[in-house]
Amino acid sequence: MKVIKFVYKRLLVRLYLIFLIGFVTTILIAEITAPKIPILGFHSIINSANPEDKIFKNQKIQVMNYPREEIEKFLDYLLLRNFWFLTAQDFYDYFIQSKPLPAEYIGRKSIMLSFDDGYKTIQTNLLPILEKLEKKHQRKIKVVLFINSGNLDKIENKSSIHLTCNDLREGLQKGFYDIQSHGLLHKKLTEIKTPDLIAELKNSQLELRRCTQDLDPNNQVAVHLAYPFGASNSKVEKYASQYYLSGYLYNGLIMKLGRLSNNYQIPRLTINRKHFPNRLINMAEKSYKLEKQDKG
């Protein structure tokens, strides 16, 4: 009898282990094969040949400066491969709200290119590249700018490190910029009092809309938010939802369709100068070709 019980227990253990291994394997395969959309998060785009053209001069964070010649190679590749450059509203409409995909995007890979903090080098170094590549490929690249409206420079001068309202208007009018919010003054939203949190969220939206109101007939400016420092919690999300349709993190993760349970926790890949064009291309190629109906 004891032998039978021992054999029975061993059999149960084996069956349990087989089930557990099968379950874990299934989860891993599902994670690996899940459809992905890369959402890349840049900051400053610099001219490496110009020693003055460095937003981040502190050695520890200089890595956030990305060379313009390298991003040009990457963007050129994306155009050659016919990528769809998503705006924040595109992502919300088609991958959160599950609106039917326009025929022109079916069968193409998609990517979102975002730039935080509103540095002047977006206008001086990135915009000319976007214009140059449009002439070359006869296709326009859309980039998402997450802007701290309180840090916008009021007047144009040589020492400016941030964009002006006129810069935003120019890029928007030319069809290159998708302008969204990054808070008012780049405060860590998880560490401030409720009135300050509301002010950060509300006033940033108001100022960006005031700047662009006559150029935004569809009210798509400042309807999405990227959290400063990528910092968020349930309280921040609660108040963000009163002003914005979605919220973006900065957590180094790729967006997996079918895995997004909260549209105020959209993941972004953190990009710095250590990500050479080939590495960015590898990230981009993880995007899958879109089908008629996909959902985050």
Could you describe each region identified by the protein language model?
Residues 144-146, 180, 226, 248:
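Structural detector of well-ordered beta-strand residues that form the stable sheet scaffold
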Residues 74, 125-133, 163-171, 200, ...:
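A general structural detector for well-ordered alpha-helical segments in enzyme core domains, enriched
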Residues 101, 106-108, 118-124, 128-132, ...:
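Active-site-adjacent structural elements in enzyme catalytic domains
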Residues 150-158, 186-193:
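Surface-exposed cleft-lining segments at the edges of enzyme active sites
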Residues 113-114, 179:
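Residue-level marker for buried hydrophobic side chains located in beta-strands
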Residues 128-140, 160-181, 241-242, 256-261:
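Acidic (Asp/Glu)-rich catalytic clusters
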Residues 40-46, 147-150, 181-185:
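Short loop/turn segments at strand-loop or loop-helix junctions that form parts
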Residues 2-23, 27-113, 120-121, 190-296:
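C-terminal active-site subregion of NodB/CE4 polysaccharide deacetylases
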